[in-house]
Amino acid sequence: MILTLIAASVLSGCGTTVPVKSAGNEADVVSQLVVARAQARWDALRKRDMDVAYQFISPAGRSLMSAEAYRPRVNSQFWRGATAKEAICAAETCEVTVMVDMLLEGVKFTTPVKETWILDAGKWWFVYQG
């Protein structure tokens, strides 16, 4: 039941869909859902759609920072792409590893970024630490 609520809640957010293993355990399903949300957030960041990216921030984070305050804090000029690779989850927290492709002074490289996501009111949210 809880898994169904989590899946329905996450899949309804920002048009995100993700394949779910029919025989997978609950941890695998939650991990897939969180990775999909993290990818959707990075897709919005890459498109410089800060209003969409802002909506992935936890309700507590959004209560402390407006969308107007968030927009100038994000500098995506060096990003060339990002792939959410995995989520390691425990209870109501996940650590997501995102591989970010960058171009800085003519040098291309990929660097891992660790993000924290939390479960709040049945939905997974990004914890903004900027």
Name these PLM-found stretches:
Residues C14-R46:
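Short, low-complexity N-terminal intrinsically disordered segments enriched in polar/charged residues
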Residues R71-K114:
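Surface-exposed, charged secondary-structure patches
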Residues R46, M50-A67:
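Short, solvent-exposed secondary-structure junction/capping segments
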Residues F109-G130:
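Short beta-strand edge/turn micro-motifs at domain boundaries
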Residues L33-A36, A40, V52, M65, ...:
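Extracytoplasmic/secreted proteins, especially bacterial periplasmic and envelope-associated proteins
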